[in-house]
């Protein structure tokens, strides 16, 4: 039996200042160690002040997952010895004696209706970034630290070990990412904005933690590898040790970093510099009223409003920018089935193949409407539409501009097509005889015609004309 639990660390990218000081959160691209202050650096005597907007963001997430919200925020010191936190403790939260998490309980449902329970949500600060200039963590000759990230406001979302398959872990993270995007508190497309620690055990064995995994896809890969590694150890009669491992995405393996600490090793106790922050009922209700439309509600609305399938609605909503593109385009293009088909089966598939996200695309509503209109009036074929998608996505060129520059307008002249078909039939006599016995072979002949016409012929029309020529 496989048990998987996740600890997800979410950057609150919507916040303008760090969690306990007034340093700006826009550190990406800045020179190392330039966005810091005595609080970020953990200097003696520096007094932290809690950013109230982080509390509001945590309450939004708690409401979105139906969690129980605490009546106060108690920050604790989590002690550990590691260079990414200069003061040798992280200001965080913990659900234990003398402390309380901002929320506990709650759940997220997967597509098969399986419920993944949430244990708690913590508010905490991000540590500094560790840089390995001459290689990886294991091979670099020395290590550098960039404290620009130190103190960045985070939410730690801890699940119960309710997942039993790496695919479920990936789906959970994709669903959580969609919730965060719709709430507008975090931009998951930014590097490092959402990272996960995965805890996994097999057949009642010791728990292994895989730290700091960068994406839902990598979480799935890391867990698949770790399950195979642990099963191999058990098969050899060896013991699975309680330990912390690192996911090497380049080599696609987990690597031992240290023995796993027990919770008591962190020596949690309330931070004396941060008094408890009161969370009132009125504050919670005000935030509840201001919540935007959440993914599950949006999925139901898309199905009802546009008549698309629940599966297609799920695919759209899992990435907010894709769902937004669909709805914006649907205002002026009413063939919703055709629109969702080209978005999911062509546009999204191409992006996934190139490891790109919809937010990285230059395609707009204007591009999509023009592309679909050109298809509808027969100016281009679906094959041409697929062929020009990369130029639309990467360069932002209009479809009409691309087909004009490359002479890609569809061939509608049937007399011309019949001449091309006759030429193909004379060249492919064996295929012609086979086609008369097996109509599926006609697809081969259609392909030959498409090649001769540079994909500018409509394959459906070509198919019908070939049948007519062959008397089928």
From Swiss-Prot:
Entries under Gene3D superfamilies matching the protein: 1.10.10.410, GatB domain, N-terminal subdomain
Record carries keyword Protein biosynthesis: yes
The keyword Protein biosynthesis is annotated on this UniProt entry: yes
Matches recorded under Pfam families: GatB_N (PF02934), GatB_Yqey (PF02637)
Alphabetical keyword list: ATP-binding, Ligase, Nucleotide-binding, Protein biosynthesis
Reaction it catalyzes: L-glutamyl-tRNA(Gln) + L-glutamine + ATP + H2O = L-glutaminyl-tRNA(Gln) + L-glutamate + ADP + phosphate + H(+); L-aspartyl-tRNA(Asn) + L-glutamine + ATP + H2O = L-asparaginyl-tRNA(Asn) + L-glutamate + ADP + phosphate + 2 H(+)
Alphabetical list of HAMAP family matching this protein: GatB
Record family assignment: Belongs to the GatB/GatE family. GatB subfamily.
Protein name: Aspartyl/glutamyl-tRNA(Asn/Gln) amidotransferase subunit B
Organism whose genome encodes this protein: Sulfolobus acidocaldarius (strain ATCC 33909 / DSM 639 / JCM 8929 / NBRC 15157 / NCIMB 11770)
């Amino acid at each position: 039996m496989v048990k998987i639990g996740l600890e997800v660390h979410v950057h609150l990218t919507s916040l303008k200042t760090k969690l306990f000081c007034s340093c700006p959160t826009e550190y990406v691209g800045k020179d190392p160690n330039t966005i810091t202050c005595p609080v970020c650096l953990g200097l003696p005597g520096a007094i932290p002040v809690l950013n109230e907007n982080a509390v509001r963001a945590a309450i939004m997430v708690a409401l979105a997952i139906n969690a129980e919200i605490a009546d106060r925020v108690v920050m604790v010191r989590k002690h550990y010895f590691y260079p990414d936190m200069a003061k040798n403790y992280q200001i965080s939260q913990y659900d234990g004696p003398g402390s309380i998490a901002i929320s506990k309980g709650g759940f997220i449902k997967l597509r098969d209706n399986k419920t993944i329970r949430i244990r708690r949500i913590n508010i905490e600060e991000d540590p500094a970034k560790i840089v390995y200039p001459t290689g990886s963590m294991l091979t670099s000759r020395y290590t550098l630290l960039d404290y620009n990230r130190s103190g960045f406001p985070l939410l730690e979302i801890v699940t119960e070990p309710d997942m039993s398959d790496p695919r479920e872990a990936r789906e959970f993270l994709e669903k959580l990412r969609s919730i965060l995007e719709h709430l507008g508190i975090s931009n998951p497309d930014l590097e490092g904005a959402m990272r996960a620690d995965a805890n996994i055990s097999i057949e009642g064995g010791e728990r292994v933690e895989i730290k700091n995994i960068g994406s839902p896809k990598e979480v799935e890969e890391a867990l698949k590898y770790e399950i195979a590694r642990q099963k191999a150890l058990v098969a050899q009669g060896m013991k699975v040790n309680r330990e912390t491992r690192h996911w090497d995405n380049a080599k696609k393996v987990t690597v031992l970093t240290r023995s796993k600490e027990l919770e008591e090793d962190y020596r949690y106790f309330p931070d004396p510099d941060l008094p408890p922050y009161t969370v009132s009922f009125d504050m919670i209700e005000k935030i509840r009223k201001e919540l935007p439309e959440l993914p599950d509600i949006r999925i139901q609305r898309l199905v009802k409003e546009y008549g698309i399938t629940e599966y297609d609605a799920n695919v759209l909503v899992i990435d907010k920018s894709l769902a937004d593109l669909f709805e914006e385009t649907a205002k002026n293009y009413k063939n919703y089935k055709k629109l969702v088909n080209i978005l999911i089966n062509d546009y999204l598939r191409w992006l996934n193949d190139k490891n790109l996200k919809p937010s990285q695309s230059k395609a707009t509503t204007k591009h999509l409407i023009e592309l679909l209109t050109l298809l509808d009036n027969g100016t281009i074929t679906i094959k041409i539409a697929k062929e020009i998608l990369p130029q639309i996505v990467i360069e932002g060129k209009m479809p009409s501009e691309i087909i004009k520059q490359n002479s890609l307008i569809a061939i509608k002249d049937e007399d011309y097509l019949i001449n091309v078909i006759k030429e193909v039939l004379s060249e492919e006599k064996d295929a012609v005889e086979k086609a008369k016995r097996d109509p599926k072979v006609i697809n081969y002949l259609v392909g030959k015609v498409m090649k001769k016409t540079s994909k500018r012929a409509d394959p459906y029309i070509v198919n019908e004309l070939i049948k007519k020529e062959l008397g089928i």
